[in-house]
Amino acid sequence: MHLDHEILNSVDVPKLRADLLTWFQSHGRHFPWRNTRDLYKILIAEKLVQQTAVREYVVEVYTALAERYPNPTALSSANEQDLAQRLSGLGLNYRASELKRLALSIVEKFEGVVPTDLTALQSLPGVGPYSARAVLSIGLGKNYGVVDTNVARILFRVLGIKEKMPSNPARNRQLLAIMDSLVPTGSEREFNLGLIDLGALVCLPKQPHCNTCPIALHCKYFASLPCS
């Protein structure tokens, strides 16, 4: 796949940003990990929702973990069997050792403080580009675009990309570069969350709700539809 920044020239980027941010203000989803700037808690949430549809029980498990293990030091000394039991309702009991290993690494390598550097954060076990960028963008407002399959789908549709989507868009440098260019300074958190929510609620893999999409007028996929 070959993409470059010129692909954005056909899009009114400032207007697209404004339309998405306006929509997010009234339609964005509400989760407790979005109400904190604690990088550790945001990181834990990202690990929980990685392979799990966000639903009420995820919120319950996250809340319980955040209260029982409020920092990396507490999680690093957790009883692994107890931790697995707390995760079993999500089918994530196998992640108990992974979470504990992550916490131990933060304690041993970074004195118990989640690093604020992208490369350092990605050096932690189980932390890839998506999680690292999400944590720093949502927690600190750093200018990183967040790309998962849902966000990549939006980019492909809006920009009219005809090539096959990469199997792991979160690691695709071209998509990451495009997203980094799209993210507005000062609204990094809201823009990334807005695209994530748009992909979950509106720009669905099948039968997307184009008629209610806030950025439909910027979208080449929408423009190609017979009744658009």
Regions inferred by a protein language model and the residue ranges of each:
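Catalytic cores of DNA base-excision repair glycosylases
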Residues: H2-S10, H27-C227
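Onset of an N-terminal alpha helix
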Residues: V13-L21
